Amino acid sequence: ISLAGTEASGTGNMKLMINGAITLGTLDGANVEIHEQVGDDNIIIFGMNVDEVNACKSGYKPMDIYNSNAVVKQAIDTLQYGINGQQFNEIADSLKNSDPYMALKDFDSYQKAQAYASECYKDQTKWQKMSLANIAGAGIFSADRSVEDYARDIWGCLLYTSPSPRD
């Protein structure tokens, strides 16, 4: 899951969308475009937006979050001290000391979004409506539309329409 402002765009979530998946993600990359198509009610966004990320970068101290958030501390300590005999010190140290993707900063928002996703899933009518809204909104990502846009906007080509068989 990318930090807002760090992902150019990806197609994986578009493939999921066209099959009815509901996106749970940051407002970054293709998620911005998906959000524009399906609206606030049919995508689950968490975390900071680009402006908030930029404002936070200069004074961000992930260790402050580690020290003040018991859930974050427990998760990182589990990485540090091991899971089933495996230690993940490099990941734990990166999160505590630099956290370049500001995962700790977005953590509380992610937890709330995950809880909301679970609530939505329990209401099957709501979940199905969200799913159908994603399928219906996915047409903008079709290859036909993309090729037509490239042909017109980049290559300056006119759209070819074949004559009717009756002509």
Spans of model-derived segments:
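Conserved small/polar residues in nucleotide/adenosyl-binding loops
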Residues: 160-167
